[in-house]
């Protein structure tokens, strides 16, 4: 099931279990995962996109291997908050993915996540070639960590 708000997404998740974060591009999908306590996001890999069925099979295998309980998709909004063709494409991907992966799906605003990932890689003195190889899954890690920080804050609010 797809959840528009992060609060709805949190309510749909089991109390524990790792999540997968996706940074969807036209040619690649950046993948990051969390630990079971949902404290830290770790960039995992970049999938070179082919057909949806093959991409979905790869994601299904990763979620099964790692026992993941939810999916976070970066939603590429414009700087004014509106949604363009890339956001519509992401929503279509989520609808298709929800048909083959019965896990809660939540969206997270991914504005500037790739910029932040690029800056972090430059600060770490990563070569251009290496940055090109890892940028998508590092961006997925930024997206997923943003969600984890928000979920942590919401959890503290509930218990206050």
From Swiss-Prot:
Top-level taxon in the UniProt lineage: Bacteria
Top EC class, one word: hydrolase
One Pfam entry name: RuvX
InterPro entries per the UniProt record, alphabetical: RNaseH-like_sf, YqgF, YqgF/RNaseH-like_dom, YqgF/RNaseH-like_dom_sf
EC number: 3.1.-.-
Predominant subcellular localization, coarse grouping: cytoplasm
GO biological process: rRNA 5'-end processing
SUPFAM superfamilies registered for this protein in UniProt: Ribonuclease H-like
SMART domains: YqgFc
Any single GO CC term annotated in Swiss-Prot or TrEMBL for this entry: cytosol
Keyword tags: Cytoplasm, Hydrolase, Nuclease, Ribosome biogenesis
GO terms of molecular function: nuclease activity
Subcellular location: Cytoplasm
Its job: Could be a nuclease involved in processing of the 5'-end of pre-16S rRNA.
Family: Belongs to the YqgF nuclease family.
Protein name, per record: Putative pre-16S rRNA nuclease
UniProt lineage: Bacteria, Pseudomonadati, Pseudomonadota, Alphaproteobacteria, Rhodobacterales
